[in-house]
A protein has these predicted regions:
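Hydrophobic structural segments
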Residues: 7-299
């Protein structure tokens, strides 16, 4: 096994067609889950988290997968419309557990619709946040950060962990960095918020996709000039800014985590190909942020 519980992936060998051209057996749901967990080792996940197969038969074949941030109705609609065999989301369907999957609420209806359509559902949450090439690494890459390293290293593998911190190629004004970050993130109605002096010079940048309140102190201790994250609440943000740097860039939860999906799709396709299999991975562009319109307030 590799670091943080990443093990080898055992797949069935290729079969032969009439002794001539090789014909590959399709991957199974279990195979794709194994590839996913090789890319995002479960050992990197937080103790409170939920990762892995949510519904579906592990033995069913998989030729196409759809990657998305949230397992919501719109994503299920897209999966059924595309006719994919499996959906992989970043967020779990039942993070806090459940005592039923009856089709009496939206989550239960999603489960029933997926099962009726023969579509499996799996997820990789904080394991993907922390992994090499995961959400935080993708954010750092989009900003061109040099020497990116974990902001909060994993106990199991310090080379991986939640968040990343690195340096820009050269110092810039905060407002100019904000413009570049806004262009690097997928479009969503709330856009990007800036906290701090827009004309301040910044060079060391910390990033963490999704809710980042818990990493404000870590970003400061690491010497970041600016911290890009999402879901910053009023009191933690104002208390933090009262204490000085890092300045804050606050995107949306969906936008800051969506950036991890295209690299994951490429890794899954490549990993299947290395094993003589074919897998088509699509990335959903359905915006699952809850906010659909932003209006400026005041006169």
């Amino acid at each position: 096994p590799g670091p943080a519980g990443g093990g080898s992936v055992a797949l069935l060998p290729m079969s032969q067609s009439n002794g001539s051209e090789p014909v590959t057996e399709p991957l199974t749901v279990a195979d794709v889950v194994a590839l996913l967990q090789a890319a995002a080792p479960p050992g990197l996940a937080e103790d409170w988290d939920s990762n892995g197969l949510i519904c579906g038969d592990p033995a069913e074949p998989v030729r196409t997968v759809l990657l998305a941030v949230d397992p919501l109705t719109a994503v299920v609609d897209e999966a059924i419309g595309r006719g994919v065999d499996m959906v992989i989301t970043h967020h779990p369907l039942y993070l806090r557990g459940t005592d039923h999957v009856a089709a009496t609420d939206p989550k239960g209806r999603c489960v029933h619709r997926l099962i009726r359509a023969g579509i499996a559902l799996a997820n990789a949450h904080t394991s993907l946040d922390a992994a090499h090439g995961g959400v935080a690494a993708a954010l750092a890459a989009r900003l061109g950060l040099l020497g990116a390293r974990p902001l909060s290293p994993s106990r199991l593998d310090p080379a991986q962990g939640i968040g990343r911190i690195g340096e820009l190629e050269h110092p810039v004004r905060l407002r100019d960095l904000a413009v570049a970050v806004a262009a690097a993130l997928p479009d969503s109605a709330p856009g990007l918020l800036v906290g701090g002096d827009p004309d301040a010079t910044v060079e060391t940048v910390a990033v963490s996709g999704g809710a980042g309140d818990s990493l404000l102190a870590a970003a400061r201790e690491a010497g970041a000039d600016v911290f890009l994250t999402a879901d910053l609440r009023h009191h933690p943000a104002t208390d933090h800014l009262e204490g000085g740097r890092p300045h804050l860039l606050c995107g949306t939860h969906w936008a800051t985590e969506w950036v991890g999906l295209p690299p994951l799709a490429a890794r899954l396709e490549a990993a299947a190909g290395e094993r003589g299999r074919r897998l088509e991975a699509y990335v959903s562009e359905v915006v699952t942020d809850p906010w659909t319109l932003r209006l400026s307030t005041g006169s």
